[in-house]
Amino acid sequence: TILSKNAALNWGEFRINIVDTPGHSDFGGEVERILSMVDSVLLLVDAVEGPMPQTRYVTSKAFENGLRPIVMVNKIDRDASRPDWVVDQVFELFDQLGATEEQLDFPVVYGSAIQGIAGPDPDELHGDLTYLLDVIVNHVPAPEVSLDGLLQMQITSLAYDQYVGVLGVGRVKRGVINAGETIFTVSDEGKQKKGKILQVMSYAGLE
């Protein structure tokens, strides 16, 4: 992954927003912008190979942001899978990166992304990803947003639609966003520009 990708799904009474982020330090700015948008991180680890070298950078930044991880041991269906060793390697990596006791107390999910299965144990896999989604709902804290005050939204990436124009993708930090409102955008240099919100959209799946 070079640029972040967004997705979203509804699960029960909750909405889960998912952002895939680059793993390499060469894209550090992109990584830090994305981590400022999320409330937790889901680390996929190969059931044979364990944590990859590029895992260190993103994970260390996640810990610096105070995020608590969820670990999924992926490709558990491979013949050479060694889940116990992989979890030990993950714990050792987290400890080396200075994780707090709370961050070291992470839930582990076992599964196969290709098969769409997950469970609490390598020998107890459910027929879908229900277990993983339940872990996300139960582990990830709700976003802290004050509905009072003027709208404040952090834009982390821009897209373009031929019918709508420029799309700002980000997270509302304060207030409520409505179509038709007049807003001011502020650049990194502090320059303000007046504009209007034409539409408010959210992701449905990958769209």
Model-derived features with residue positions:
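Short beta-alpha junctions and helix-cap segments that line functional grooves
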Residues: 5-6, 28-31, 54-59, 168-170, ...
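Switch I (effector-binding) loop of TRAFAC-class P-loop GTPase G-domains
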Residues: 1-12
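Alpha-helical scaffold elements adjacent to nucleotide-binding pockets in ATP/GTP-utilizing enzyme cores
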Residues: 8, 30-33, 37, 54-61, ...
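Gly/Ser/Thr-rich beta-alpha loop segments that engage phosphate groups in nucleotides
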Residues: 1, 25, 52, 118, ...
